[in-house]
């Protein structure tokens, strides 16, 4: 945990002299990201052509620049990760690892797929993503960085499971490749190629250079939470708290569905309260502000209601939001880890002695204040200073005993809004029985594994489906999930 223990370098396959070698971007080659492999799964309630899915995916990845995604991961003599890009991709050295399983049965009749999460009429815990590993990746797919380093395999694994009325499409990859924003770009561009709209695929940005290499070398203002940076014995006390907590409590993952009407009512109420409190008739909070405040209140519900314990909320923030006019042009695809963090500091009592609107508005203000170009650059400067001083880019802001919740909202990635209808062989579920159009995902699911770090309290928000429901999931203490499940089940319908 926390990278305190290191193992010797794995033995790599023989090098290919014709490979193009490119170092990973600094933001990609970190201790945390090295330890994580992720899988994204999409359920389509239609029968999709697996051959079309495979060929269009390969066609996208073999475009100029995009070929980098098919690279093999290797360690150089300095212990840093490199991309080894084959001169050409073929059956011996494919651009993507491909697997396909077909079941001659409805998705609703299969013993495992019949348990896939379904939307609920009220906020509810609807499943455990780990229960579906058999459906989301093949047994041969790499599960750790060690697997990638010791085998001559591409970074992406495409696994398709076909039923008589549905199709599950899953992509697994090392987190060193990209974040949720980059993953969404791959997904959307794949759909463009599938639709024969290749000319609309944006050019690949940063093929053999890092556009963020010098970002944060200077900053025009201090970072807003500089005084909260943990150093010295306070940092080590924080680590001890985390190690103890990880040892004492078992971690488990769950999937939560939040119906659209429920969240809309919560947001409407919050905006009314905020405007009445501030006298500002233009004050607002977003769906994300309300959703993260609402779930954080659930997650800290085991503490005494009047506790002054610090609760730190982190929202991932895409750097392209502030760098879209220069370093990360919006007209190009940047497949890398290019997110920063925006923090909000509250206390447990803020969630239980004040209305939910208080926490939601605090999150909104943090997003507005911390999401400027100047503040994003100031935080990046702190990260670079931490790297120079301590050998990693992991500054910790807050206090040693704080409770942390982290969120990454992928709604803007439009996972539920991407059109795969060009691959339909046969429509599955009747149109009147579903909210989404044929060829659009009815479910998006995520899972991640880390060989070194506890991913507890990291909650991706997968987005909003066609019916308006929000989906989020992630690992918490098992006892916390059991309490949340009970509270949601017993909450009166409004």
From Swiss-Prot:
Positions of disulphide bridges: none
Main location: nucleus
Keywords recorded for this protein, A-Z: Nucleus, Transcription, Transcription regulation
Localisation: Nucleus
Superkingdom per UniProt: Eukaryota
Induction profile: Expression is induced in complex medium (Czapek yeast autolysate medium) supporting calbistrin production.
Keyword Nucleus found: yes
Described function: Transcription co-regulator that might be involved in the regulation of the expression of the gene cluster that mediates the biosynthesis of calbistrins and related compounds such as decumbenones. Calbistrin A is a secondary metabolite with an interesting structure that was recently found to have bioactivity against leukemia cells. It consists of two polyketides linked by an ester bond: a bicyclic decalin containing polyketide and a linear 12 carbon dioic acid structure.
UniProt protein name: Transcriptional regulator calD
Native source species: Penicillium decumbens
Gene (UniProt): calD
